Amino acid sequence: MGVRTAYMPVLNTDEFMEGKTVEYVKLANGVEIPKIGYGVFQISKDDAPRCVREAIETGYRHIDTAQSYFNEAEVGQGIKDSGIDRKDLFLTTKIWISNYGYENTLRSVDVSLKKLGTDYLDLVLLHQPFSDTYGAWRALEKLYKDGVIRAIGVSNFYPDRLADMVAFNEIAPMVDQVETNPLNQQIEARKNMVKRGVAQEAWAPFGEGMQNMFSNPTLAKIGEVHGKSVAQVILRWLTQRDIVALPKSTHKERMEENLNIFDFRLSDSEMTTIAGLDTKTSMFFRHDTPEAVDRFVGYVKERAGRE
């Protein structure tokens, strides 16, 4: 079970818009994901339609949302307002814990489809490694086989949990989205993903600016060499490692900056220098402790009934 060929990174020079190119990661099933996506975590219902529309106008062709972000309908409105052809957009959502379980997950995907205004999704992830992940996964397998979802995966699954999901399911996860940034580089997790043919996505690529990420002198010095910002250096570092990055901004000029990273490459020595920044520690919290379970039980209660 769960045996298939590994994903492979590919370079695609098709233009998003004049002067912009993008690189892709090809999943085990052949589906290609743009290496830069627009993340909408913590973007309000009021701002989401404008932000998504502006991101698409800027050139993003990959949008990442989640049921627990409570902005799927507004993301759908932004997509509609942009006028983009649905086939030209890679759209991801994630299943929240309270929607786990076979029937619950099937129903929740149907709700997400309606909110997003689409009849299919490019990628659906299990958002957290808790509760009935196996029932939820079998629902995603069914929807994948039915053609409702083009690719399926997980988020925040540590190496042992990912190995378990790969080994004991008919269809192995194609993606694992985890916190990845210069201070928490996920080296061991990455090795495990590559071994098992799972592509990596990075949430919080800037660590939400904590620990003075944007003024880090090492990253700033590298940026000066290339005429790029610290944010652009981080995103290039991720994409050169064939990791899909999901930056977020509500400002159009920052959206443009975050997308404009494929016109330079970091040298091997620069990549090695950045590797030296790794603390091997989450900038937020771990997901594999009893306290983490308690935290997410609290989140489920807190978010119950919200739309």
Regions found by a protein language model. Give the residues of each.
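Beta/alpha (TIM)-barrel catalytic core signal, keyed to glycine-rich beta->alpha loops juxtaposed to Asp/Glu
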Residues: 24, 128-307
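Short, acidic/polar
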Residues: 43-55, 101-116, 160-163
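Acidic-and-aromatic substrate-binding clefts and catalytic sites of carbohydrate-active enzymes
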Residues: 43-46, 65-74, 98-103, 129-134, ...
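A structural motif
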Residues: 60, 118-121, 149, 173
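Short, well-ordered amphipathic alpha-helices
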Residues: 73-80, 109-113, 140-141, 162
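A short, structured active-site edge motif that brings together acidic residues
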Residues: 86-99, 122-129, 156
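CE4/NodB-like, metal-dependent polysaccharide N-deacetylase domain
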Residues: 105-125, 142-146
